[in-house]
């Protein structure tokens, strides 16, 4: 039996692409008229005393221990120990939306939601899966891809996890993307696809021409009457090292593509602003067919996923990021770090362009934190272990044929030796 509040949200979403794509769990989700909502009312109208929220308060200010204050002297108690709102700090959400529009000018006249703040990008992907993925609604992603996609889809949601071949001998394999998406649409009546650029593990971002082709693939499926959820995992957005890369997110092109397309953008300062451990991410969504009431209803669905899991995200992290964004030196400092990553990329590019291997073939890469090798003749896990044991170099085995190297975490003066060691050990292994 559905809660009446869930029924009300579902009624608002009736006839929309959201309703067609929602999982069973998504249909059950609602935001209770409980502590949070009643506390919100009291925050506005309880002028004498507020006995709603479980915090220790003195003179209308959360009590903060001196041991905390000494560590964060520039933040006030509401920015350190108080609970933050379920969907995140309103000011920070507005700032992130402004930044999103600045980085994606094609969104200027398109209706998109106010970004919802979540505890990191993994949480963002997990909440999307909660609302839209289940045992009858599989998730589609690239092969190779980040292993957390399969963990979220299969282990958490009990769903099937399907993949398309990300690359062929020519580069980005758009033919297999189209083929697989159309097969999914025909079999299940709808498609849920994660498109992650810059891609993890390969470090590849599509060109302007490739983005137009991806957009056409999605639009063709939508025009056939099938619903498509396009989840843009933009964790490494903007870290581009070649001139022909499309500078905007796929989300900018999907946001009002068709009434049958629901576009969701998962992003945040984690990688873009070098704030990995702050665990602050954002979810933004859009669809040509959604009215404001339906946008509000889907936002409430996401808030219910947050409320029923972590309740709210870390207050200090949000406060620190908000103040950093307001610091005029922030973008300058970020640009310097991006230049450092670019230099590391250039060194890796120079090495792989001037060295050959009968075992290792670099997958296409032009952006992000990583590059990866297609491994032939040997197992990538065996190579990983040998490189670690013999040279003290850590890399990641994604699958038996894919080895990932995060050049983002390797000092410039060590890059040539690291890659030479990987190549040399790989060649030695096939001659043993």
Regions found by a protein language model. Give the residues of each.
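Conserved core of the PLP fold type I
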Residues: 79-230, 237-258, 413
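Conserved core segment of the aminotransferase class I/II
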Residues: 4-9, 13-15, 255-339
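Short beta-strand
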Residues: 48-50, 85, 360-366, 395-398
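Conserved glycine-rich beta-strand-loop-beta hairpin in the small C-terminal domain of fold type I
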Residues: 334-349, 360-374, 400-402
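Well-ordered, non-membrane alpha-helical segments in soluble/globular domains
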Residues: 28-37, 65-69, 177-178, 208-220, ...
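Short, solvent-exposed loop/turn segments at secondary-structure junctions
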Residues: 54-58, 122, 146-147, 198-201, ...
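PLP-dependent enzyme catalytic core of the Aspartate aminotransferase-like
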Residues: 98, 102, 182, 259, ...
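N-terminal small-domain helix-loop-helix segment of the aminotransferase-like
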Residues: 2-7, 15, 19, 23-120, ...
